[in-house]
């Protein structure tokens, strides 16, 4: 059983982990909100990085991290769909030996976000109403 003070410490430590991994986002003006963190369930989490012009949602499910980009209408779009629309194929990351897409690893998602942040901002704003 996890008591409240242990939960606060785990959440603080987890926040530090996210800020270390995705710290370039806070350097770029984003703030972090951890929506859920379940260390008892495979370490699953959901978190949102928010900036004035874009939101980025991270959802970790059994160590696979999915990244969605917030659109102006309140909907979310998979990062990979936006990248594919501008000619950056999902195949840039190979399949693992057991057939899983290697792009879902947390460190790969962080590198992708850092590399393609401007492209994602542009793609997300292109889908915003004027």
What are these regions, as identified by a protein language model?
Residues 2-21, 32-46, 50-130:
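Intrinsically disordered, low-complexity regulatory regions enriched in serine/threonine/proline
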């Amino acid at each position: 059983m996890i008591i409240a003070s242990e939960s606060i410490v785990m959440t603080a430590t987890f926040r530090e982990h996210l800020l270390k991994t995705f710290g370039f986002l806070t350097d770029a003006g984003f703030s972090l909100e951890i929506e859920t963190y379940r260390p008892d369930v495979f370490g699953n989490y959901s978190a949102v990085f928010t900036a004035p012009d874009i939101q980025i949602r991270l959802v970790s499910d059994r160590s696979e991290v999915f990244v969605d980009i917030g659109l102006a209408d309140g909907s979310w779009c998979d990062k990979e769909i936006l990248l594919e629309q501008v000619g950056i194929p999902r195949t840039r990351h190979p399949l693992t030996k057991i057939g899983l897409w290697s792009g879902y690893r947390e460190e790969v998602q962080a590198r992708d976000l850092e590399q393609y942040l401007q492209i994602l901002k542009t793609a997300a704003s292109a889908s915003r109403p004027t």
